[in-house]
A protein has these predicted regions:
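Generic secondary-structure transition motif, activating predominantly at the C-termini of alpha-helices
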Residues: 2-6, 45-52, 108
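Charged, low-complexity surface segments at secondary-structure and domain boundaries
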Residues: 28-31, 49-53, 112-123
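Flexible, solvent-exposed extracytoplasmic
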Residues: 67, 72, 77-139
Length: 139
């Protein structure tokens, strides 16, 4: 398959080997581990449902369509052979499979940059329920 689109896209694997897979494999992902990462961003990602240490890392695992849209994840590559989870065909279009990898196109993503109304500054992510945090982000 040859990709014929904008080279500025974000993707993630469903099962990472390390928290730095985007860096190791040179792709634009959301997972990160860095001593330079802002703790507040790590806190926010944790409250949004990402796995992390709440200090300087957060790791992508299968997420909700809301999270994937908000963080502009254009492609999800399912490489978790042990999982029975299915990608919902309403949200994701199966592109191709090769070996243990199956690539999906996210049908609903927001652009990498977009404008929100002024009320976003009152949004709080201090909640232990990631579904409520994600819902509050879109209200």
């Amino acid at each position: 398959m040859v990709y014929e689109g904008n080279e500025n896209y974000r993707m993630e694997l469903t099962s990472l080997r390390a928290r730095m897979d985007p860096c190791w494999y040179y792709y634009n992902g959301v997972s990160t581990f860095s001593s330079m990462a802002y703790e507040k961003v790590s806190n926010m990602q944790y409250h949004l449902g990402m796995f992390g240490n709440y200090i300087n890392s957060y790791t992508y695992h299968r997420q909700t369509p809301v999270y994937n849209a908000f963080f502009a994840l254009d492609y999800i590559v399912d490489n978790d052979q042990g999982s029975t989870a299915q990608m919902n065909e309403h949200y994701y279009e199966r592109l191709f499979s090769k070996g243990k990898f199956t690539a999906y196109k996210n049908n609903y993503t927001l652009p990498v940059a977009f404008r929100a109304n002024e009320e976003i500054k009152y949004w709080s992510h201090d909640n232990s329920n990631p579904f409520e945090v994600q819902s509050g982000l879109f209200e």
